[in-house]
Design a protein with these regions (language model features):
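N-terminal-biased segments
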Residues: 1, 49, 64-66
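Asp-based, Mg2+/Mn2+-dependent phosphohydrolase catalytic module
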Residues: 40-43, 56-165
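Short, acidic loop-to-helix structural element flanking the phosphoryl-transfer center
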Residues: 22-51, 57, 61
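Short, mixed-charge, low-aromatic patches
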Residues: 14-20, 48-54, 106-113
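Short amphipathic alpha-helical segments, especially helix-boundary/capping motifs
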Residues: 11-16, 35-37, 50, 68-72, ...
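Metal-dependent phosphoesterase signature
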Residues: 1-37
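Broad hydrophobic/π-residue packing in well-ordered secondary structure
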Residues: 16, 20, 32, 47-49, ...
Length: 165
């Protein structure tokens, strides 16, 4: 069995980048349609917003550019920036530190089981958006909702007291 070396790693990375170029991610199909509305709502309420994703920064930036969402986020963090990604809480701990907020001031919106576990381990409140397309286990979330619009309604009713920094 051949040892994994730098040359092989570089070759695989090059192949992966070529594949991604030839098969772009269908961001329009994956992004929840109510994302722009809730981001605008949060901006008007002067809520600090961050994006902490396990995806590569390349993929994150591509999605943000395609949907013109860059201006909403004070902090954007990629899982590539950490030795371990979700469910390890480091991505959320680092993001909260960069935003200058504590776990008790933070609401994490997640859809994945590992993301929910990471948010919980970071000490933050975690709400899950039910996404029936992928069948994620979301039972550990503090609250499950069916859309970002539902989250906006809940935040309006609570006057954002629990997440406003």
């Amino acid at each position: 069995q051949e040892a994994f070396d730098e040359e092989k790693a570089s070759e695989l990375q090059e192949g992966y980048e070529q594949f991604k170029e030839n098969h772009p991610m269908p961001y329009a199909e994956l992004l929840f349609s109510d994302v722009p509305d809730i981001l605008e709502f949060l901006r008007q309420k002067e809520v600090k917003i961050a994006l902490a994703s396990s995806s590569s920064m390349f993929d994150i930036k591509q999605m943000l550019d395609i949907h013109q969402l860059n201006s909403y986020f004070e902090v954007v963090v990629s899982g590539n920036d950490f030795k371990q990604t979700k469910p390890n809480p480091e991505i959320y701990q680092s993001t909260m530190k960069k935003l200058g907020v504590t776990p008790s001031e933070t609401l994490i919106i997640e859809d994945s089981e590992k993301g929910i576990q990471a948010g919980e381990a970071a000490g933050a409140t975690v709400w899950a958006i039910e996404d029936k397309r992928f069948g994620m286990n979301q039972e550990k979330a503090d609250l499950k909702v069916d859309s970002l619009t539902a989250i906006q309604k809940l935040l309006t009713e609570s006057s954002l007291k629990m997440i406003k920094a």
